[in-house]
């Protein structure tokens, strides 16, 4: 539309009979709106990590317990630690922020993550800082292993499934055998209690000859 008006405006002085047109080639820009500036990112250029290690286990019921240990130049304000885990389906980053141990040390830091339920098919747990300087230095991962006692009386079927996922088949079959024996003994105990409280009394009342001393 602006191009058509420009052609008419240039042609009007030549034609002589064309009425004058008020031409506006460009619209006025909207007024600037002042916005609050974003808070500056922490200066982590002097932050250095010389050693980083993570250990993680899965307690009964798929509860993750992880420890992240760092050593280095930690005298500057620490960036926010982040955790996410990887499953067969992909990544998930909705994990609570690890809790830092209360310590005055400027050389070593430890972060804990306790009692967070993760899927049974979790492959890796990954730790990093956000934001960070030289992120590859801080990136560390660990493979969670299911922690099952030698007498797995309180282990669940989910724990046995996790053992199979970790390819620890011998431990999984052992735990399954112990759980089967446990459930069998529990059923025997229930049957004995039911027999003593109800069945035996009913037989005494209706068939007393079965308990006669003359036999």
UniProtKB/Swiss-Prot annotation:
GO biological process: symbiont-mediated suppression of host antigen processing and presentation of peptide antigen via MHC class I
Disulfide bonds listed in the record: 56-142
Compartments where located: Host endoplasmic reticulum membrane
Predominant subcellular localization, coarse grouping: host cell
Domain named Ig-like H-type: residues: 47-146
Stored InterPro entries: CMV_US
Signal peptide annotation: 1-17
Keywords recorded for this protein, A-Z: Disulfide bond, Early protein, Glycoprotein, Host endoplasmic reticulum, Host membrane, Host-virus interaction, Immunoglobulin domain, Inhibition of host adaptive immune response by virus, Inhibition of host MHC class I molecule presentation by virus, Late protein, Membrane, Signal, Transmembrane, Transmembrane helix, Viral immunoevasion
Pfam family, one: CMV_US
Transmembrane regions: 183-203
Membrane topology: Single-pass type I membrane protein
Keyword Membrane listed: yes
GO CC terms, sorted: host cell endoplasmic reticulum membrane; membrane
PTM field: N-glycosylated. A fraction of newly synthesized molecules retain the signal peptide after the N-linked glycan has been attached and translation of the polypeptide has been completed. Delayed cleavage of the signal peptide is determined by the first four residues, as well as by the transmembrane region.
This protein's record includes keyword ATP-binding: no
Cytoplasmic side: 204-215
Glycan-bearing residues: 73
Lumenal side: 18-182
SUBUNIT field: Interacts with host TRAM1.
Record family assignment: Belongs to the cytomegalovirus US6 family.
Function: Participates in the inhibition of the host immune response. Redirects newly synthesized major histocompatibility complex (MHC) class I heavy chains via the SEC61 translocon to the cytosol where they undergo proteasome-dependent destruction. In consequence, infected cells are masked for immune recognition by cytotoxic T-lymphocytes.
Identification of the protein by name: Membrane glycoprotein US11
């Amino acid at each position: 539309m602006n191009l058509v008006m420009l052609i008419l405006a240039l042609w009007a002085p030549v034609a002589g009979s064309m009425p004058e047109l008020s031409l506006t080639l460009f619209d006025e820009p909207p007024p600037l709106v002042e916005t609050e500036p974003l808070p500056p990112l922490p200066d982590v250029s002097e932050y250095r990590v010389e050693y980083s290690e993570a250990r993680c286990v899965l307690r009964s019921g798929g509860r993750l317990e992880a420890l992240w240990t760092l050593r280095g130049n930690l005298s500057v304000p620490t960036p926010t630690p982040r955790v996410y885990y990887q499953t067969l389906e992909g990544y998930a980053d909705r994990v609570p922020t690890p809790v830092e141990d209360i310590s005055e040390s400027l050389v070593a830091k430890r972060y804990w993550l306790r009692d967070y339920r993760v899927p049974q098919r979790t492959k890796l747990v990954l730790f990093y800082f956000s934001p960070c300087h030289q992120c590859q230095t801080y990136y560390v991962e660990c493979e969670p292993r299911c922690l099952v006692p030698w007498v797995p009386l309180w282990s669940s079927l989910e724990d046995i499934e996790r053992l199979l996922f970790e390819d620890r088949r011998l431990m999984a079959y052992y735990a399954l055998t112990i759980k089967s024996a446990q459930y069998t003994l529990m059923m025997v105990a229930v049957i004995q209690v039911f027999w003593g409280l109800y069945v035996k009394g009913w037989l005494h009342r209706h068939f007393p000859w079965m308990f006669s001393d003359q036999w």
